[in-house]
Amino acid sequence: MGKNRTIVLGAVLVATLLTGCGGQDAVLEQHAEAEATSSPETTEVPAFHFESGTLELGDFDPQTLGDDLFDPCTEISEEEFAAAGITGVENEPALYRGNAQGCRTDQPEPAVTRTVIGARTTSEDAANAADYEFSFVESSVDGMYTFKNPIANPYMCIAQVDTQRGGLAIGISVSGLKKEKIDPCKVAVSELSNLYRSINNG
């Protein structure tokens, strides 16, 4: 029951962000300024170089994305997942509700549940969603951010990076005695960073 409940909650978390609007524009402006001051000599667009094709990082418009939402369950191979330490990947029907699509995986460790998600949620949606904690993070993946709802579930967090085909995210939920020992946001950031590194350096 715990695992299914977590997965469904993750689907709801991603979907409800699309209607959220709050007041964290300053956070996004600060991030934009930081990007503007980065080296102008860098011309290569950061991307995930999957066997199925290149997934470039960048902004997207969920209203015009249509059917081109990236599906991590079918467009990332079993071998590519395994290289990042992700096994047991299976489609999760609860996530296929139009706003997101994704899959559950084997637990990275006992009491820690992991989902891989393709979402129409943008960084702006996440930053403006009421009751959510949002933060850009330092990572090898340019523009990665985390968000969670401490009211609905303080032990679940999603790390996401926006791409030209929607958000690519990994959600982590912690249960049992590990709730007070593991930071789900740190784990989610590590998992998504590992996927990026393994794909691009493999």
Which stretches of residues belong to each language-model region?
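Negatively charged, low-complexity tracts enriched in Asp/Glu with abundant Ser/Thr
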Residues: 69-74, 138
